[in-house]
Amino acid sequence: MRFLVLIFFIISCSENSSHYFPLDKIKIWSYSVEIIPEVENRALYKKTHLSMGKKKLSLNEEKKKLFPILRENGTTLFYEFLDDGIYRVGKKFLKEKEITTESKRMVLPVPLTPDKTWNVDSETYLILRKYPYYDYRATTNFKLNYKVASMKETVNTPSGTFKDCILIIGNGKTNFIGNNEIGSIGIKIYSKEWYSKTIGLIKMERIEETDTDMFGTTKMVQLLESYQKF
C-alpha cells in the first residue's frame, strides 16, 4: 500500500516536460527583450522563434527526430526529446548546409519535479562596454546550475496572464581575463525562466554581475508578446 501511495505521489508531483516546451503545438513565439546595463544605455529589441515541427534529420550521419527552431537572426537551433529530458543538440547558421553538433544541453529534465537540479554549459553575453570605434564584450564560458524552484507560478506578460507555470532558477560564476587595462573580472550569473504549460517559455530574467565599475551589472528581461499555434 505504501508503495502505491509513493507511486501516486511521484506521478502527481511530476509533469510531462514536453507540455512546457511544446515545439509541435506552437508555431511562433514573439518576445520583447530589454537590456538594462549599469554603465551603458538601455536597449530594447524584438526576438522571434519559429518552430518547424518534428523533422527526420541527419545528425552525425544518424537519422534522428529533431525539432528545428529558426531564430530572428537566421540561426536554427535543433532540439531532441529523450527519455531523461529535452536537449538542444545542434545549430546551423544562415548560410550553412550541415548541422553543427553541440554537446547536449538540457532545457528541461524528465520527470519534471520540484527541486530537480541539473547543470549546463553556458557563456556570458550581456557584459558590454562601448568605445568610439569598437564594442568590448566580456564573453567567457561557465557552468550554469539549474533548479526547479516552483511549479505554481502566476506570470503576467503582454500576451496575458499565465497560471501554474514552472520557475527554473539558475546561478553560476566565472572569471574573464581581459587585456592589460581590464585585467581579471569576477562575474556572477543569475537566471530565472518561467514556462507555461502548452505555451512554453513566457518570461526570462538574467543578471550578469561583475566586480568592477568598468562593466557593472547588466540585467535582461524577456517577455512573451504573442504566440501562434500550428
Q: Where do the language-model regions lie?
A:
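Sec-dependent N-terminal signal peptides
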Residues: 2-12
